[in-house]
């Protein structure tokens, strides 16, 4: 938006910059991948369908922030406001960089649209959620073993275990956006996956 490019052009622009930097340092890759490919889309959608078939995904109608000036629902990073936990004035719609708390855009105090600084309104939209609580036990076992084998940093271990101790909550994995990985489920054709659902899958899909 700030650079006046389409989403696809911006993605290509930074892909070329990253690639040229590695080339300048004489670093080469068997495959220098990205998540905006048909290959990644197919794998991300397949993983979602398996999660959905196994009962880890559910539908829920929620209130979201909508900018009447921009005429669209606002993605997490397009909303800023006051953190309800530490009162940091420039917290984002997904997290507060001061206290580290994960947030939902509707939790922000005095929310404002990052594009035009106006106050967004609440509108209802139906989304898909991943029921992380169902996976808590398996995740704890995995973290206990993988953090040792993978030599995780002390900070990574403490943050992860803090989230597990506090209890995992359902997380919305879809967004009312046009750019992204399409959701392969009837009734959700106009939505895409939240980036933090499909982007980590890229680490797997690039090696497939």
Name what the model sees in each region.
Residues 55-128:
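Cys/His-rich short segments
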Residues 1-60, 68-72, 84, 141:
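N-terminal Rossmann-like or analogous alpha/beta NTP/dinucleotide-binding catalytic cores
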Residues 33-35, 39-43, 86, 95, ...:
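Structured secondary-structure scaffolds
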């Amino acid at each position: 938006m700030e650079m006046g490019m389409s989403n696809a052009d911006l993605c290509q622009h930074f892909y070329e910059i990253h690639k040229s930097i590695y080339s300048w340092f004489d670093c080469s890759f068997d495959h220098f991948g990205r998540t905006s490919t048909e290959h990644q889309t197919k794998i991300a959608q397949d993983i979602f369908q398996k999660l959905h078939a196994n009962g880890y995904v559910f539908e829920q109608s929620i209130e979201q922030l909508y900018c009447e000036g921009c005429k669209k629902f606002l993605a997490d990073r397009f909303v800023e406001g006051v953190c309800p936990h530490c009162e940091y004035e420039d917290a984002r719609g997904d997290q507060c960089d001061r206290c580290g708390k994960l947030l939902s855009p509707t939790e922000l105090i005095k929310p404002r649209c990052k594009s035009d600084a106006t106050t967004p309104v609440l509108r209802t939209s139906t989304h898909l959620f991943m029921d992380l609580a169902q996976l808590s036990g398996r995740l704890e076992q995995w973290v206990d073993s993988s953090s040792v084998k993978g030599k995780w940093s002390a900070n990574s271990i403490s943050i992860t275990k803090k989230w597990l101790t506090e209890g995992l909550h359902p997380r919305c994995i879809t967004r009312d956006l046009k750019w992204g990985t399409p959701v392969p489920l009837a009734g959700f054709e106009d939505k895409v996956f939240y980036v933090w659902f499909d982007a980590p899958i890229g680490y797997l899909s690039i090696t497939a």
